[in-house]
Amino acid sequence: MDIKEDDESRVITPTELQLHDSVTARTGTLWTAVAHIITGVIGAGVLSLAWATAELGWIAGPAALIAFAGVTLLSAFLLSDCYRFPDPNNGPLRLNSYSQAVKLYLGKKNEIVCGVVVYISLFGCGIAYTIVIATCSRAIMKSNCYHRNGHNATCSYGDNNNYFMVLFGLTQIFMSQIPNFHNMVWLSLVAAIMSFTYSFIGIGLALGKIIENRKIEGSIRGIPAENRGEKVWIVFQALGNIAFSYPFSIILLEIQDTLRSPPAEKQTMKKASTVAVFIQTFFFFCCGCFGYAAFGDSTPGNLLTGFGFYEPFWLVDFANACIVLHLVGGYQVYSQPIFAAAERSLTKKYPENKFIARFYGFKLPLLRGETVRLNPMRMCLRTMYVLITTGVAVMFPYFNEVLGVVGALAFWPLAVYFPVEMCILQKKIRSWTRPWLLLRGFSFVCLLVCLLSLVGSIYGLVGAKFG
């Protein structure tokens, strides 16, 4: 039988979200904001930080981590001032999303550019997660093989991860039929717990390796390359990996919208950002520096799948299993906004088309007779998206290179350019004054770094594919 789209399954429009938000009680505090930020930034990106630190060396590696922390914190301060409009302290209009703020301050064209960058970033995360989950699944099998047959055994399990990527893609085709983001709270919670678990295991294993070695590995210049030009591009690729891990600009205004007042939301948000960035940086230092200190020039691109650790094999397996569970949920967290935007656009453009607007109900015995609602457009669109991300991952299964490209593409526009431009407009900073020059200079330097990181990451991606 067919069922008309009901309130639960349809896509909510921005106007309805704003009306719904206006009657929502805001009870958030400093510590809930800190928790939201930390949960949002601790993810698969931490697995590459040891490699990035190793490529940069003992001086440039920690310095880069601190520099990106400073840029992220400044971005958070600028963005938190844009939450209320037009006055940052008492403005009557609250902006509860990043895109909404960009549209109001910078106009429709900038909102479109912002949306394109966001969706490219989310798409890139889906590709990266597909690569990582295949690597981790294969690592679990190899770990058990090494434990049974010795560390010198031939445990290849094929020459690539394509089989595991296809399995993950099939799983995500099913998972992608979850109606919308509001039905995924449990999935996000599991993903957050898993990300912290495997990150702490990685730190613990690296620290144990340092104690076992009784020395700190590594050098000031980092891992040597074949020539100076090669080293330069790898360094910029490493910066792209760090850029992927740090920013939380996209979720900042949504978190700020949960805060109660007084005190003013921007004050609480700035304090929360400071605490969160401090914790984040300390955590990233542990992941990056402990990993490099443990393995030196042999630091793997992915700390938990490069087989620097063989024992305890059960703990290595458990860490990789946590990554798998995290990425099953994490893939959906990054994919659902793309699904929602595409479906909202098609529904608005073709409201009477049955293929797009009609839902069909089926009763499944396994669900105790409950009716499952399926929409043909949703099934086709989401399946096609999963197939594309899986296909790209199979074509370019290079973890660090893909992270570098995604990080370099998204960091400057989302964490620097838009916050700076909105701040200049909101505070009415006049051209060629000292604050204007400082903000524009800051934005320009970050742009140069991100462009070089993008070129370095693309160079590495092409080299890995065709070299």
Curated annotation (Swiss-Prot):
The chain crosses the membrane at residues 30-50, 59-79, 112-132, 164-184, 185-205, 232-252, 275-295, 313-333, 384-404, 405-425, 444-464. It comes from the Eukaryota. Its main location: membrane. GO terms for biological process: amino acid transport. It is found in: Cell membrane. Residues 1-29, 80-111, 253-274, 334-383, 426-443 are cytoplasmic. One of its GO terms (molecular function) is symporter activity. GO terms for cellular component: membrane; plasma membrane. It holds the Pfam family Aa_trans. It is a multi-pass membrane protein. Residues 51-58, 133-163, 206-231, 296-312, 465-467 are extracellular. InterPro entries: AA_transpt_TM. Keywords: Amino-acid transport, Cell membrane, Membrane, Symport, Transmembrane, Transmembrane helix, Transport. The keyword Coiled coil does not apply. Amino acid-proton symporter. Stereospecific transporter with a broad specificity for neutral amino acids. Belongs to the amino acid/polyamine transporter 2 family. Amino acid/auxin permease (AAAP) (TC 2.A.18.2) subfamily. PANTHER family: OS05G0424000 PROTEIN-RELATED. This is Probable amino acid permease 7. It comes from Arabidopsis thaliana (Mouse-ear cress).
